[in-house]
From Swiss-Prot:
It comes from Haemophilus ducreyi (strain 35000HP / ATCC 700724). It comes from the Bacteria. The lineage of its organism: Bacteria, Pseudomonadati, Pseudomonadota, Gammaproteobacteria, Pasteurellales. Homohexamer; trimer of dimers. This is Cyclic pyranopterin monophosphate synthase. Catalyzes the conversion of (8S)-3',8-cyclo-7,8-dihydroguanosine 5'-triphosphate to cyclic pyranopterin monophosphate (cPMP).
Length: 158
């Protein structure tokens, strides 16, 4: 079984020392789903939302969140991300928006937390912009889809 890397021998939380690791290409993608009623979704799609372009705002929020993950998650390293991509897909059959992120860099540590933070904040932004018209919007199934690079190898969600 793997050990927690952020816990020292005394059981205290510490940032992992990555100084001796070699730079490798690292990528990660994550997804989240935002479920709402059909009227709210149509308001977003049609561009009739009084706060403006919900998807553009969510996309920018996700990008900004990935860049600032190290400020939000206490033991994350500040990273020089080389790529952040946010895709939003409307699933009209289920009244959902699927958000997918892709983060990439050449560095000493992975970008999983950046990918997860990106979709989380993009989803929260959709909620924030739509809460005036619907308060019971559901954010769910936030998960890592893929990661590559580093000594732990690749991961692909089932």
């Amino acid at each position: 079984m793997h050990q927690f890397t952020h816990i020292n021998t005394n059981g205290e939380a510490n940032m992992v020392d990555v100084s001796i690791k070699q730079d490798t290409i690292r990528t990660a993608s994550a997804e989240a789903f935002v479920t709402m009623n059909s009227e709210t979704l149509q308001m977003i799609i049609s561009g009739n939302h009084h706060k403006g372009d919900v998807f553009a705002t969510a996309r920018i929020a996700g990008i900004q969140a990935a860049k600032r993950t190290w400020e939000l998650i206490p033991l994350c390293h500040p990273l020089l991300l080389s790529k952040i991509e946010i895709q939003l897909e409307v699933l009209t059959a289920t009244n959902q928006v699927r958000i997918e992120s892709l983060c990439k860099l050449s560095g000493k540590t992975g970008v999983e937390m950046e990918a997860l933070t990106a979709v989380s904040v993009a989803a929260l932004t959709i909620y924030d912009m739509c809460k005036a018209v619907q308060k019971d919007i559901l954010i769910e199934n936030i998960r890592l889809l893929h990661k590559s690079g580093g000594k732990s190898g690749d991961f692909n969600a089932a």
